[in-house]
Structures are given as structure tokens and as C-alpha cells.
Design a protein with these regions (language model features):
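Bacterial N-terminal signal peptides
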Residues: 8-17
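Long, intrinsically disordered, low-complexity segments
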Residues: 121-124, 196-198, 219, 265, ...
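Conserved, well-structured interaction surfaces
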Residues: 42-51, 55-66, 88-169, 182-217, ...
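Bacterial Sec-dependent N-terminal signal peptides
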Residues: 3, 16-41, 159, 197, ...
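An aromatic- and glycine-enriched ligand-binding surface/loop that stacks and positions planar moieties
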Residues: 22-99, 172, 202, 207, ...
Length: 544
């Protein structure tokens, strides 16, 4: 049975938790007496300065949370790629052209979802800055050893949010104080912010607890040392991208010439990836024998999951909306849930999985619903007219309005085990949302070895053998395919395509946008509203 994670107590501080800056920096007034009470002892300091920050890891409204909700980080990383598509189905899913705009890379500088994502990331950074200031204020009045650990955890969490900003937006403001007026914030280069994130993780990781964050208990859902080391490996893996301040000139730094100090040793980017992947391995993580264990109802016991968003329909408001919006209405109804009949796999996904051939990857049926579907008792699901519901994967396109398969085109999201006890249309479920897992550690290491001129076959095929997929040689091409096969629907595709230099290429239903061969769409624009507030911010190249 899932146990509550400790920061649920932070609901009593909801008003304090809203202390972020209006438009990422403007502090709201608060009651001083209440604030002093909130930090009067070490336990309260932890709850209010550290644990309260985790209320923002998940979410229930658009653009909030690292995953689980719509029109936020996950959608920007998924529906802008060859992994997923939200077809227009007659009067459904056009939404003012939003989903087509993502898929076609035609989002513009006034996109509400991009702005809301920016504001969400800076909201949590603002809260983190305030927490660090509060922790520093109480130095000498509480246990200093505990304060060091609290500070490290908040710094690591803030670094995680800056990592997403570097990945999504490139050149962004580096805000380290809760009191700086919004108009005075200067813009930093992508590399400057990246270097800051690296330093923060280097300095904070040794002070973090070594517990497995996915396991219920004191550190459930929190940033621990293995989580930080996973993020470190991810930062090093993308070093060529994140240290490039001009991503439109066709020139990238070489990872073999980017160096990091790791435990006193100078290692290039690829060696650094290997070192931190090995560190995560030594922490005791391993591949689960059954791929689906990682996404099961009550998946807290997974030996593979490293960082998760805790889910408990009776305790938390965190939602998983992606299954809900993908399943056909009748399909979801057959589980006693609701659905919105939306998101589907692309034609490119079907080709990568070799769907419809004898060589289909074993993970296809674990990640997608295709063809005839059944309820949990094995009964065929039917449409309202009594005919059998059958998903037609190859009929998917950007606009299928008025087609005979308008409502049934496309393979749908499966991935997570059905929790038929879920509430709020099934969006409140017991399956923790998986952010980081050990299979990624193995594939990161394999890729780093290949990029460094080494052999990465062992790590690649450990992942493949788990699902009885045939042996493959580790090359950059096979590794990119493997990441699609292994991490379908997990929110990594955009970052992977950018790193492999393939994000702007054309594919089914998506011609290359004029001018984007330069790479300008590999980052999103700084929202125009934010730039109007702060004249110091220069728009990213290619956007007007």
C-alpha cells in the first residue's frame, strides 16, 4: 500500500507556497507573524522551505508540473516531434490551431502554452530562491548539519528547473534573488546558465541523501543523490547543445573537447556521462525483468525507476492526463473511466517499431493500443452503433476531419497499467509518473561510449534483451531508434532529436518550416509578454 510522502503536510502552508513572483519575479505581500511561526523550528523550516517546493513537481492544471498535465513541458517535448500527433478530428482537437502549430513548429512568440511553461519554471525558481534565503537566515539558530542538507536539496531542485529552461529556451535570465525587480534581470547565455546548473549539482550532490527517491518513505519523490547524478549524466550527454550559444550557425562544440572535473579528474563530456551513469548503477538500480512493472498500478517498488511524481488519488492532486486524452470515449468507458479520443502515434513511430511486420518490436504492444481493443474482462469494446472499436494506426494524419476513420485513426497511448479505480475521469490514479529510470542510464552510457569512439553494444543490448529484442550493434542510428522504442510517451523525444541534429527534418504531415534548417526552432521563443516586461531580454534567433 502506498504511504504518504512527507510534504503532503505542506497543504497547511498553501498561502506561503504561492509566494512566487508574479510573472516569475514579483513577490506578493504576506503576513510577517504567520511567516515567523512557519519557521520557528527545524521541522517547520523543512516543511515550509523545502517540502513545500515539491507541491509543484506535479500538477492538475495546464502547464503546471514536470509531467502529467497538458500544454506544458511534456507537450512541448512530445508533440513537436515525430513521436506523437494530435490529429484534428472534425470539431475535436483543432483548438485554435494549437496542436497543429506544435507539430508544424509554427508556434510564434505569443503562444500561451509556451508563456505559461516559462512562468511555471520561474515560479518554482522564485520559490526556491525564497527558500534558500530563509534557510540562510536561520543558520546558527537550528542544526547546521540539517540546514546544509536542506540547502543542498533546494539548490539541486532549482538546478533541475534551470535545466529545463536551458533545454527549452536557451538564453534565459539567471535569477538568484527573490528581491530583484523584474526590469533589472539580465539575460544570461545558454552556456552561462548551463555552467551554473553544473556547479550547483556538483556542490549540492555530496550533501544529498543516497536514498532511492521512488520508494515510499522519508525521501519519496524528493531529489536525492542518485537523482542528481542522473541529471548530471543528462547534462553531460547534451553538453554539445547546451554550451552552444548560437544554435543557428551550424557549428557545435565537440563533446570530446568539453571537460568537467569529476572527483578531481578532468573528463570529457562523454567520459563524464559514463562516470555518472556508473554512479547511479552503484546506487543499486537495475532493470526490472518485466518492462511493464515500471508503469504498473502501485509501481513504487520498481527497482528501475529513479525519479517519479508520486500519485495517490486520496492524498494528492497530481494528475496524469495523457491516457485520458488519448483513448477513444468508448474504450475509456469500458474501463469505467473517461476519454477524449485525441493523441496518437505517428507514422514514423510505426515504422521504427516495425508495426505490422513479423519483426515488430516487443514493446509496441506494451506502449500502444492498436487494432481491436478489449475491456479488463477480455470483452471486445464496441462503438455506440454496436460495431467493434478498432484503432487504425496507419490512417493517422494531422487533419482527418470528415474521413471515415476520423474517430478511430491512430495507435493510442497505453504504457501505464489501467487503474480502473482512478477518479476524476481516471486522471487521479495510483501509478506514479515515471520521470527518470535506469534503462536511460544504460542507453546514455552506450551513446556516450559510441560518441567517444568506444563500443556501446553491451549497454544497448542489456536494454533490448529485457524484452527479448534481437541483438543490435550500437551506432548513433540504432541508439536513436532504441530511445524511441524504449521511452515512447516518456517525454524525451525532442531533446533526443535536437542532440542528434534531426529535430528540424521533415516527416509525415510535417514539411520543414521555412528557415528552420538553421536550427532556430530547436529552442522556443522567449514569450513576447515577458520581453515587454523586461527590455533586457533579447529574442532567440529566428523569432520576430
Amino acid at each position: 500500500m502506498k504511504r504518504s510522502f512527507i510534504y503532503i503536510a505542506c497543504f497547511l502552508l498553501l498561502s506561503l507556497a504561492q509566494l512566487s513572483c508574479d510573472d516569475f519575479l514579483r513577490e506578493k505581500p504576506r503576513d510577517r507573524i504567520f511567516e515567523e511561526e512557519a519557521y520557528k523550528n527545524l521541522s517547520d523550516l523543512y516543511l515550509n522551505a523545502v517540502a513545500s517546493l515539491y507541491n509543484n513537481i506535479g500538477g492538475y492544471s495546464d502547464s503546471q508540473g514536470l509531467q502529467g498535465t497538458g500544454r506544458g513541458i511534456y507537450d512541448l517535448n512530445t508533440f513537436t516531434t515525430d513521436e506523437a500527433i494530435m490529429p484534428t478530428r472534425g470539431g475535436d482537437w483543432y483548438d485554435g490551431g494549437f496542436w497543429q502549430g506544435l507539430y508544424l513548429h509554427n508556434w510564434g512568440v505569443n503562444n500561451d502554452a509556451i508563456q505559461a511553461t516559462w512562468e511555471y519554471l520561474y515560479k518554482v525558481i522564485g520559490l526556491s530562491n525564497k527558500s534558500l534565503e530563509r534557510i540562510a537566515q536561520y543558520a546558527g539558530t537550528h542544526n547546521d548539519r540539517e540546514l546544509v542538507a536542506y540547502e543542498a536539496e533546494v539548490r539541486a531542485l532549482r538546478a533541475l528547473y534551470y535545466y529545463h529552461l536551458v533545454d527549452l529556451f536557451g538564453n534565459v535570465p539567471l535569477v538568484l534573488s527573490s528581491s530583484m525587480p523584474v526590469k533589472e534581470v539580465k539575460q544570461s547565455t545558454r552556456q552561462e546558465v548551463y555552467d551554473f546548473v553544473v556547479r550547483e549539482l556538483q556542490q549540492s550532490a555530496p550533501e544529498l541523501n543516497t536514498a532511492h527517491s521512488n520508494l515510499p518513505g522519508t525521501y519519496y519523490g524528493r531529489i536525492t543523490r542518485p537523482v542528481a547524478h542522473f541529471l548530471w549524466a543528462k547534462l553531460a550527454l547534451n553538453a554539445e547543445v547546451y554550451t552552444d550559444n548560437d544554435w543557428t550557425d551550424g557549428i557545435r562544440p565537440d563533446g570530446r573537447n568539453i571537460y568537467f572535473n569529476v572527483d578531481g579528474e578532468e573528463l570529457n563530456a562523454w567520459q563524464t556521462v559514463e562516470a555518472y551513469c556508473d554512479s547511479v548503477t552503484k546506487s543499486g538500480y537495475r532493470l526490472e525483468e518485466d518492462y511493464t512493472t515500471n508503469f504498473a498500478v502501485f509501481n513504487e517498488s520498481s527497482a528501475e525507476n529513479i525519479f517519479i511524481i508520486p500519485m495517490n488519488k486520496n492524498l494528492y492532486t497530481n494528475q496524469m492526463q495523457y491516457l485520458f486524452r488519448s483513448r477513444h470515449y468508448n474504450h475509456a468507458k469500458a474501463y469505467g473511466l473517461s476519454g477524449e479520443n485525441g493523441s496518437s502515434a505517428t507514422i514514423e513511430v510505426l515504422k521504427t517499431f516495425a508495426y505490422g511486420t513479423p519483426q515488430v518490436d516487443p514493446r509496441f504492444d506494451k506502449c500502444y493500443f492498436a487494432g481491436i481493443v478489449y475491456d479488463l474482462k477480455g470483452n471486445v469494446v464496441r462503438l455506440d452503433d454496436g460495431t467493434i472499436l478498432e484503432y487504425l494506426p496507419w490512417e493517422v494524419a494531422l487533419d482527418i476531419s470528415n474521413e471515415p476513420y476520423e474517430k478511430t485513426a491512430g495507435a493510442r497511448m497505453k504504457k501505464y497499467e489501467v487503474d480502473d479505480t482512478g477518479t476524476k475521469d481516471g486522471k487521479l490514479m495510483e501509478n506514479d509518473i515515471v520521470l527518470y529510470r535506469y534503462a536511460d542510464v544504460l542507453l546514455m552510457k552506450s551513446e556516450a561510449k559510441v560518441r567517444n569512439g568506444e563500443n556501446g553494444d553491451e549497454e544497448l543490448n542489456r536494454v533490448r534483451s529485457r524484452v527479448a529484442a534481437p541483438y543490435r550493434e550500437a551506432t548513433l542510428n540504432t541508439l536513436l531508434d532504441e530511445r524511441q522504442l524504449e521511452f515512447a510517451w516518456e517525454g524525451w523525444r525532442r531533446q533526443d532529436l535536437v542532440r542528434f541534429g534531426l529535430f528540424t527534418r521533415p516527416y509525415s504531415s510535417r514539411p520543414q518550416l521555412a528557415g528552420e534548417a538553421s536550427g532556430y526552432t530547436t529552442v522556443f521563443p522567449i514569450p513576447d509578454k515577458v520581453r515587454r516586461m523586461n527590455p533586457n531580454l533579447v529574442q532567440n534567433p529566428g523569432y520576430k
